[in-house]
């Protein structure tokens, strides 16, 4: 059973609306649904909300480190609460998926995502679940044949139409979460992947 859901993003008001903070957006909606509130926890280098799911503790974590150091936060909480990699779901922005698309995946590479790289380094394994929220790739949006800088792209706010699609993918992820949390990962994946 999943004991920890991590949303990836960067701290600070200046990053609140960045595409790179899609994981934070997901956790903010989930915490509200679970009537949980985030509290700063220095020992975990992040903001933590604790909820109950089917009588079990469920931790929600938003690292307060910058994206590249997310593993420091995840590792600290997992060691303290004895949470294994298989009991973790990391919610992340995904350049290689179009806005409006969400995908569940166990393990695999990092796709160049620095937050995932650091988590993998701290957990010593890639074998944890990821919920990938599509934000699109700048090569798909430039339109004028010139490449757009990826770092610049992820640290910008999406256009309104894109934001609506990302919000829809967050909603789709939340809809399959009960199936996922009770361990029916295959059905959760099939339902989510059929939605776009």
From Swiss-Prot:
Annotated residues for binding of tRNA: 15, 66, 68, 114
Record EC number: 3.1.1.29
GO CC annotation terms, alphabetical: cytoplasm
Source organism superkingdom: Bacteria
UniProt-listed CDD domains: PTH
Active site: 20 (proton acceptor)
Assembly description: Monomer.
Protein name: Peptidyl-tRNA hydrolase
Biological classification of the source: Bacteria, Pseudomonadati, Pseudomonadota, Betaproteobacteria, Burkholderiales
The encoding gene: pth
